[in-house]
Swiss-Prot record:
GO terms for molecular function: glycine hydroxymethyltransferase activity; pyridoxal phosphate binding. NCBIfam families: PRK00011.1. Belongs to the SHMT family. The lineage of its organism: Bacteria, Bacillati, Chloroflexota, Chloroflexia, Chloroflexales. (6S)-5,6,7,8-tetrahydrofolate binds at L120, G124, H125, L126. Pfam families: SHMT. It comes from the Bacteria. Its main location: cytoplasm. This is Serine hydroxymethyltransferase. It comes from Roseiflexus castenholzii (strain DSM 13941 / HLO8). CDD domains: SHMT. GO terms for cellular component: cytosol.
Length: 436
């Protein structure tokens, strides 16, 4: 109760809901690849008095007075994230990864422009051209995918499509692709067809920041990410640039004719283009998270994420599960359950009953609807934050298999649930105090 003392007194209905969610996080295994546990320090910054402050604009150029302290925290967040990724430019104001992506699209594209992005069913993301998303509704997307045999990105296919379609932008990144991405090849393809290269690294950002996966910063014209997932910070977005800080397309100001910097274009699109006031309490939490990411122990953590994912994938494959591409280089894996005769929805719901949280996910050539799917996606960032290592991944693989193999057996699911509770008790969530 100590984390919610005031709230219990003022609004017990909301306190009870939050307490229930805290119990769920503490007592269950979190395998959703996009989720993690923010530190107590991150949560304290996000719950601070900075939530009261409006600060439209940027440090030194605000539309409101009284911004001397929030200017400092935004400058600190920008400096830290630039150091973390080796970037020359950073904007830490986007409220989410999707809004960061929106700012990029709105800056460099016009409605109807052609964009090449990864097929959602092959591991892409909603904002990479899904017809139900603004990206697919405003722009003309063509898709690249994975090779049906290797289940990895087919770079020759990407180049072939790019030459044929001549997109204005190539979007690279994924939400359910388990292999390292060769950004250098994507840049070569983009340069060949005169396209703008945009990299969305929301999922593997923490692993990229510590040099464990290739970085797009030297290759992409612009890079976006979220700040949670493998970065383990607050929910939010960022935009970064490396060597292409100067405008490579020669865009000029209408009145003065001055060549515009890409940083100017992006900053103006974030505000006033797609947002108003920044969330200064979240920016403070981002600064705290970036500070944690810069510590040596974060590299140890990031390495363990990958080892855990590879161990979990190997243990599941040994039990007959089809993991796309035959393994993982990062923090996640996509499991095609069709050889098990189980839908993604059924697996997710059964695992939920066993206190193992996953998400159903479409797989290539899926014949089921997005609300059912033929696969599930698993990730190890949250498990690794709890301190779990390879032996626990072997145990968790066995528990997952027990549930899916006996998906309609309540006795088995209840037994697994008790084992999950015992395992979680051995590895408490850092900073998440037990309820009274």
């Amino acid at each position: 109760m100590s984390m919610l003392q005031t709230l219990w007194r003022s609004d017990p209905a909301v306190a009870r809901i939050i307490d229930g969610e805290m119990r769920r996080q503490r007592d269950g295994l979190e395998l959703i690849a996009s989720e993690n546990y923010a530190s107590r320090a991150v949560m304290e910054a996000q719950g601070s008095a900075l939530t009261n402050k409006y600060a439209e604009g940027y440090p030194g150029a605000r539309y409101y007075g009284g911004c001397e302290w929030v200017d400092q925290v935004e400058d600190l967040a920008r400096a830290r994230v630039k150091e973390l990724f080796g970037a020359e430019y950073a904007n830490v104001q986007p409220h989410s990864g999707s809004q960061a992506n929106m700012a990029v699209y709105f800056t460099f594209l016009r409605p109807g422009d052609k964009v090449l992005g990864m097929n959602l069913a092959h591991g892409g993301h909603l904002t990479h051209g899904s017809p139900v998303n603004f990206s697919g509704q405003l722009y003309t997307f063509v898709a690249y995918g994975i090779d049906p045999k290797t289940e990895r990105i087919d770079y020759d296919q990407v180049a072939e499509i790019a030459r044929r379609e001549r997109p204005k932008m190539i979007t690279v990144g994924a939400s359910a692709y388990s292999r390292a991405i060769d950004f250098a090849i994507f840049r070569q393809i983009a340069d060949e067809v005169g396209a703008f290269l945009f990299a969305d690294i929301a999922h593997p950002a923490g692993l990229i920041a510590k040099g464990l996966l290739p970085s797009p910063i030297p290759y992409a014209h612009v890079v976006t990410s979220t700040t949670h997932k493998t970065l383990r910070g607050p929910r939010g977005g960022i935009i970064m640039m490396g060597k292409d800080f100067e405008n490579p397309f020669g865009l000029k100001a209408a009145k003065s004719g001055r060549t515009l910097m890409m940083s100017e274009l992006l900053d103006k699109m974030v505000i006033p283009g797609v947002q108003g006031g920044p969330l200064m309490h979240v920016i403070a939490a981002k600064a705290v998270g970036f500070g944690e990411n810069l510590q040596p122990e974060f590299e140890t953590y990031a390495r363990q994420i990958i080892r855990n994912a590879q161990t979990l994938a190997g243990a599941l494959m040994a039990r007959g599960y089809h993991i796309l591409s035959g393994g993982t280089d990062n923090h996640l894996m996509l499991i095609d359950l069709r050889n098990k005769g189980v839908s993604g929805k059924a697996a997710q719901e059964a695992l939920d009953r066993a206190a193992i949280t996953t998400n159903k996910n479409a797989v290539p050539n899926d014949d089921k609807s997005p609300l059912i799917t033929s696969g599930i996606r698993l990730g190890t960032p949250a498990l690794t934050t709890r301190g779990m290592k390879e032996p626990e991944m072997e145990q968790i693989a066995a528990l997952i298999d027990d549930v899916i193999t006996h998906i309609n057996d309540d006795h088995t699911i209840n037994r697994v649930r008790e084992e999950v509770f015992a395992l979680c008790a051995r590895f408490p969530v850092p900073g998440l105090e037990p309820s009274a």
